Amino acid sequence: MITHFRQAIEETLPWLSSFGADPTGGMTRLLYSPEWLETQQQFKKRMAASGLETRFDEVGNLYGRLNGSEYPQEVILSGSHIDTVVNGGNLDGQFGALAAWLAIDWLKTQYGAPLRTVEVVAM
């Protein structure tokens, strides 16, 4: 399992970090900037391709949802922000959103639908 997550992170973290990358090695994705919006759209595509229902709320937060089989009204939410400060690092908030998505995707693949709904949020 650890090998799976290491490989998944090594493959997806550089991809996610490429949005808003700056020449000094950091990235800049200020809230509601074109870079932030592009990141949200691309992350939405990835979550949808993995079988999650995706949606944006009225302020732009992105959700990826896997409905529960027994208690769908009970929701477990995990994630983080994907905006950055100027020249931010790639292990800032985006890692929390990415880790939540990778964990839900792995659990879905291994065990199928959860009893309770699980949701990823990228803010």
Stretches with model-predicted labels:
Residues 49-50, 62-92, 100:
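Catalytic-core environment of secreted peptidases
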Residues 13, 17-20, 50-54, 104-111:
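Structural signal for hydrophobic packing residues in well-ordered secondary-structure cores
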Residues 1-8, 28-35, 39, 92-95:
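Catalytic cores of large soluble enzymes that bind and process phosphate-bearing ligands
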Residues 58, 80-82, 123:
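Fold-independent oxyanion-binding glycine-rich loops
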Residues 78, 88-123:
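Alpha-helical metal-binding/catalytic segments enriched in His/Glu/Asp
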